[in-house]
């Protein structure tokens, strides 16, 4: 494999509660949050239920010599784990940031490879939502059949229950939905 290409790695099982609370709130401007987390679940045709799905968490790699966005980490991992392109897959992502234009393009190409895969993306925040290039990337995903939405309270609770190492702590929605209404309206406007 070329050294500049993302290499597959194993996803994390869960993330720390403080990491979740810091990186996932619906915020317009999230200073200091340079990492992107991607929580995923993969359901195959035989197991279209959450109980039997493959799930985990990817985080972007920020090393200058081996940069890899969380979406790229997932795509590389998925191709290794699920080489059969004619099977049916239902994939759900919960992202702390929406995809950049490059990742959006790579996801569209990935969906052309896996024609029987449905992808739903629930994102906490919109990355550079005012930039036309980022808007175009989201539109390309939408046009490719990707379900796109801003994470709701139910989505946050699902992530807490399935992707956070909460050690029995109860889910608290405090501050997670701060700018939900604005972000949801902005996404709808972009996709119109």
Swiss-Prot record:
Task: Give the enzyme's EC designation.
Answer: 3.5.4.38
Q: What class of enzyme is it?
A: hydrolase
Q: Which GO terms describe its biological process?
A: cytidine to uridine editing; defense response to virus; DNA cytosine deamination; negative regulation of single stranded viral RNA replication via double stranded DNA intermediate
Task: Name the residues annotated as catalytic in the UniProt entry.
Answer: 71 (proton donor)
Q: Which cofactor does it need?
A: Zn(2+)
Tell me where on the tree of life, at the top rank, the source sits: Eukaryota
Q: According to its UniProt record, which reaction does this protein catalyse? A: a 2'-deoxycytidine in single-stranded DNA + H2O + H(+) = a 2'-deoxyuridine in single-stranded DNA + NH4(+)
Residues in CMP/dCMP-type deaminase domain copies: 15-141
Q: Does the keyword Cytoplasm apply?
A: yes
Q: Which InterPro entries match?
A: APOBEC/CMP_deaminase_Zn-bd, APOBEC_Cyt_Deaminase, CMP_dCMP_dom, Cytidine_deaminase-like
What is the annotated localization of this protein? Nucleus; Cytoplasm
Recorded GO cellular component terms are: cytoplasm; nucleus; P-body
Question: Which GO molecular function annotation, any one, does this entry have?
Answer: RNA binding
What broad class describes the main subcellular location of this protein? nucleus
* The keyword Transmembrane is assigned to this record: no
Q: Where does Zn(2+) bind?
A: 69, 100, 103
Q: Which UniProt keywords apply?
A: Antiviral defense, Cytoplasm, Hydrolase, Metal-binding, Nucleus, Zinc
Quaternary data: (Microbial infection) Interacts with feline foamy virus protein Bet. This interaction does not induce APOBEC3Ca degradation but prevents its dimerization and incorporation into the virion.
Q: What does this protein do?
A: DNA deaminase (cytidine deaminase) which acts as an inhibitor of retrovirus replication and retrotransposon mobility via deaminase-dependent and -independent mechanisms. Selectively targets single-stranded DNA and does not deaminate double-stranded DNA or single- or double-stranded RNA. Does not reduce infectivity of foamy feline virus, feline immunodeficiency virus or feline leukemia virus.
Q: Which family does it belong to?
A: Belongs to the cytidine and deoxycytidylate deaminase family.
Miscellaneous comment in the UniProt entry for this protein: One of 3 related APOBEC3C genes in cat, APOBEC3Ca, APOBEC3Cb and APOBEC3Cc, which are likely to have been generated after two consecutive gene duplications.
- Know the name of this protein? DNA dC->dU-editing enzyme APOBEC-3Ca
> Organism, per UniProt?
Felis catus (Cat)
């Amino acid at each position: 494999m070329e050294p500049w290409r993302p290499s597959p790695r194993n996803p994390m099982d869960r993330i720390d509660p403080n990491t979740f609370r810091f990186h996932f709130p619906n915020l317009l401007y999230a200073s200091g949050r340079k990492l992107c987390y991607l929580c995923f679940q993969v359901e195959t045709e035989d197991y279209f239920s959450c109980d039997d799905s493959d799930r985990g968490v990817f985080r972007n790699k920020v090393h200058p010599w081996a940069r890899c966005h969380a979406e790229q980490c997932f795509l590389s991992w998925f191709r290794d784990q699920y080489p059969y392109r004619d099977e049916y897959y239902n994939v759900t992502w919960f992202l702390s940031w929406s995809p950049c234009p490059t990742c959006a393009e790579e996801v569209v190409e990935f969906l052309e490879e896996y024609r029987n895969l449905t992808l739903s993306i629930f994102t906490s925040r919109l990355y550079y939502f005012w930039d036309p290039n980022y808007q175009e990337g989201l539109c390309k995903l939408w046009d490719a059949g990707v379900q796109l939405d801003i994470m709701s309270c139910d989505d946050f609770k699902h992530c807490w229950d399935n992707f956070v190492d909460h050690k029995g702590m109860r889910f608290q929605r405090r501050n997670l939905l701060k700018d939900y209404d604005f972000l949801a309206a902005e996404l709808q406007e972009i996709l119109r």
